């Protein structure tokens, strides 16, 4: 093995030590760490943009479908996306109502059940930001099950740019996944050519892709 690319899930410090002790270049995709090169997005700013889109559509009662608070991996992405959501609410002077938050584990199945729970609560939101497209798909499925039309009765926005988002007509924050992989590979090749090169972190932009799952 000449190099190692680690995607999404953050290694523990012990795992980092083991990888770096291999003496080969290591690059992270989807997260940052000061000890090696990385390529990622700004999850906080991107989530703020997604939430601002809902605010711009006139929504004031905005819900959040976030990752599990008891995540055993202590993954920073759900926390950062929640932080961006909260920042957008605060910047627009909107009250945060804790009962408008439900949790999934970034799968369609758990998101669908979480959305069932949210829609059964009083004073339900008129829009919801889902921290992933997979969870947004589950939310859309549950909304239909409750006799709600998306976006007429509730607006839903996701995050990631899943390949099925276009077919589901889902508004989403799209990550440049292919470019992230290309830049990680480029970073690895640079370190192979110049082993003494310092690790560096790249932050790539995301794109708000507006489709028909959000409306005023």
Briefly describe each language-model feature range:
Residues 3, 14, 18-216:
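Bacterial carbohydrate/catabolite-sensing allosteric modules
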Residues 7:
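Residues lining the SAM
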Residues 11:
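Conserved phosphotransfer active-site motifs of two-component signaling proteins
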